[in-house]
């Protein structure tokens, strides 16, 4: 009887561990229309809106199994809504994070994220000048699992077009490890969004600090 009890206890413990692991599987957030996010730029004439939602605090970042902040990355949930009657092309889209001190950062490719996670000292932003006095980083052990690689791949913003009356979304990752407060005074510039005839829309500029403010309550 005691043996059976011990077996049941162990089985329950194992089941609990499995359940916890399963619960940690990444699920990409369901995107809302871009203009509903605090940090967005809405081109009403062109009927296209783009939003940027930084996952820069522990509560939001807990959807990931990877601690991106610990490795110097800023995940931004990027949302494009096309309310027009024609598709738009984003195959040549360029996204740039511009900080308060005019530092410019472009999204990091998955393979560069893998390299940083495997080797925390790796430089994934060779084109960006470091700060005169780098912010000391916590020593991080380099390792990456297949699950983490799959999570990074599946979370990426990968759309090449946005069909009429639809929204596309996904994460862009920026290497901001040397910046203490990357959101303060920063904005995201977006170019290379084209209409169905190939003409480029006016560039989008999104003030990231607005993401720190809750949306106003309806009257």
Task: Annotate the PLM regions.
Residues 7-8, 37:
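Hydrophobic transmembrane signal anchors and adjacent membrane-proximal interface regions, especially
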Residues 21-219:
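Conserved functional micro-motifs across diverse proteins
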